[in-house]
UniProtKB/Swiss-Prot annotation:
GO terms for cellular component: endomembrane system; membrane. Residues 120-130 have a biased composition (Polar residues). Residues 1-130, 228-257, 279-342 are annotated as: Disordered. This is Cell death regulator Aven. It comes from Mus musculus (Mouse). It is found in: Endomembrane system. InterPro entries: Aven (IPR026187). Residues 15-26, 108-117, 287-297 have a biased composition (Basic and acidic residues). Residues 44-55 have a biased composition (Basic residues). Protects against apoptosis mediated by Apaf-1. Coiled coil: none annotated. It comes from the Eukaryota. Binds Apaf-1, BCL-2 and BAD (Bcl-xl). Its main location: membrane.
Amino acid sequence: MQAERGARGGRGRRGGRERPGGDREPVGAATALARGGCGDGGGRRGRGRGFRRGRGGGGLRGGRWEPGGRGGGASTRVEEDSDSETYGEENDEQGNFSRRKIVSNWDRYQDTEKEVNGESGESQRGTDFSVLLSSAGDSFSQFRFAEEKEWDGETSCPKQNSALYVDSESLVRALEQLPLAVRLNVASELIQTTIPLELPQVKPRRNDDGKELGMHLRGPISELRSAAGACPRSLGRGSLRQSPLEGLQKAPTPTQSVADHLEEELDMLLHLDAPVQEEGNISPDQTSRDQEPEKDGQVAQEETGPEKPSVTREKNVEPEQPSTSKNVTEEELEDWLDSMIS
């Protein structure tokens, strides 16, 4: 009875109590530990060693208190099993993920190449696009509806659709047989069928006026200079402003008069410096002042007629012009030229 009580965790006498100072180990200690209890095998008073937490007191497992007793051991064991399984799964997953590698499947293609080489003796990893298209088949090999098959079955005959059928080759041959005038839709007279043996001669138009001018200018220089010496050197402002073209336009129709006028223009161009120097020395203010007394003298002559003072006055004005023209500086001459140009 006592042995049974000890196995059950009762009050029975324990075998180690008779030894003084010895460790008392209950008979049912192994059974109590197997059940998850601690102390004295899960006794009522909790006399076992360790932490006394009543009947079947729990113990410290993994840094936390686990429930003891009859039902505590089984639940703890299930939790430990589940924790170990999850921890193992995590370790397995981490290990598999870290060790994962890309597996090449090129061996399959190499096997197929070996077979092809054994059959034909040629190694070809890729084929041409045309070969792929030919192997794919045409549109008739694909899926088609029943209506499409019916359309293909109905072969169109040119005799049935004569209104819509046109033979292009025969049309081209018929058009080539037509004459060129009909094809171009122009008059037949405009088209020259034969090639001419001689081309028509085109006579260029000559400028007679330019020829005459060139012949006059080609004359000897001595004659031009002699003719130029005959013309007066004192030219007015109007003659300076006239261009050679204006002089030619105003020239008379006879050739002699044209030649004389050309000589005059040439002499004018050769002696441009002399009249410019003579007239350039006269400022516009002085010319206006000189013109005023001339006008006054003319008016006085018309009014008084035989009065001598007006005549003497005109004579005195004329010699004054060259004396005053010499005193004009170059700056005044440039100013006058600028005023004339503007």
